[in-house]
Amino acid sequence: MDKKKLSHSSLQSSVTSVLAALLCILIGLIVGFLVLLAINPAHAWGDGFVRILKGGFHDAPYGVGKELANAAPLVMTGLSVAFAFKTGLFNIGAAGQYTLGAYGALYCAIMLKMPWFVCLLAATLLGGIWGAIPGFFKAYFNINEVITSIMFNWIGLYLVNELVYQNGTGPMYDVRNTRTLNLSKNPAFAQSIIPDFGLNKMFQTNSTTIAIFLAAAVAILIWVVLNKTTFGYELKAVGLNKSAARYAGINEKKNIILSMAIAGALAGFGAGLYFLSNVSQWNPLNSTSLPAMGFNGISVALLASSNPIGTIFSALFISHISVGGSFLSTKYYPTEISDLISGIIIYLCAFSMLFRGKIHGLLFKNADKTNVNAEPAPAKTETEMEGK
């Protein structure tokens, strides 16, 4: 009976979380449309709102392929933030971990000419190491992981830029394009590019690979680890109450470091998916801004309520409206309008707890009441009482 009640409660929680996220999206889109009206009323509907809603389908199949290529790293950075949050930590250092992952993947591809899966492993390893450092400071010195991870974002950016650029003489650096060497333009790097299995032809792009399927598989794996394994239970127990976890014999210091290391590894893996799909090349001259994928991962995790499976769908949605925004005519609207709508939706996600409470009250108010018609538990007999 207890298991049945627990399962029913979990189902209610999942339903309310999904509906709350959909409500956030709906309100965000409405507010976004009002902004479009305020900027340019004449083109707010057809050339603005509808084009954003169509996303990549406005220029299918190319646009859809672009959505999938951008969604893969978003799933991973969203997982990075969500995993840490599930274990009681806030990983705002996904951008730095993503940066180190990008370097690991590109170094293995360009300098060592390794197969793509080895390059992905290097990206995962470097991201994990970079994530473990704030975890170490949190575990042994109780230094807030938000502060240390922000600092390591910038340290990672400048370190990677210097390693790639080397005053313009770096072996990974293409002086003419001011970026790392393009993997697709050199046959020597062919084995380092993630295979597409015909997806590039299907979507008429050069960057649509199996990356999105790899990201989805990792998301499912993380859900299984968190919900179906003893290791996942220990991680969540430490996040909920370190003192209680310690009393239960769980090594909270080890688990804090592991949580941040895994979160960093996920972000690094996402960078590998992005750069080994040849979506873009690394620009070491960009020293003023961190990779947007890292911070967009926070948006993905918030919209998904930190559910690993939910990050797949929230990443696809964020990618969808971002690509839709890129198709807006600059005569009428700035391309950043899609980022504005995303920001509004994520801002509303801060109220998702309120929305979930209201939705739960509307849908399940009768289900939560005690069933007065249920048979009461049988009373103990005098013999049973005396036996005690």
Question: What role is predicted for each listed range?
Answer:
Residues N153-N227:
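Transmembrane helix-bundle core of multi-pass membrane transporters
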Residues A20-L37, L74-V81, A102, L106-C108, ...:
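Hydrophobic core segments of alpha-helical transmembrane domains in multi-pass membrane transport
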Residues L36-L37, G55-M111, T124-I143, A244, ...:
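Single transmembrane alpha-helix segments in multi-pass membrane proteins
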Residues D2-M76:
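Membrane-interfacial amphipathic/re-entrant helices at transmembrane-helix boundaries
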Residues I129, S192, D196, F203-Q281, ...:
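Helix-loop-helix "hairpin" substructures at the membrane interface of multi-pass membrane proteins
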Residues L266-G268, L273-G343:
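Transmembrane alpha-helical segments in multi-pass inner-membrane proteins
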Residues F83-G104, L226, F231-E234, S329-P334, ...:
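Cytoplasmic juxtamembrane regions at transmembrane-helix boundaries
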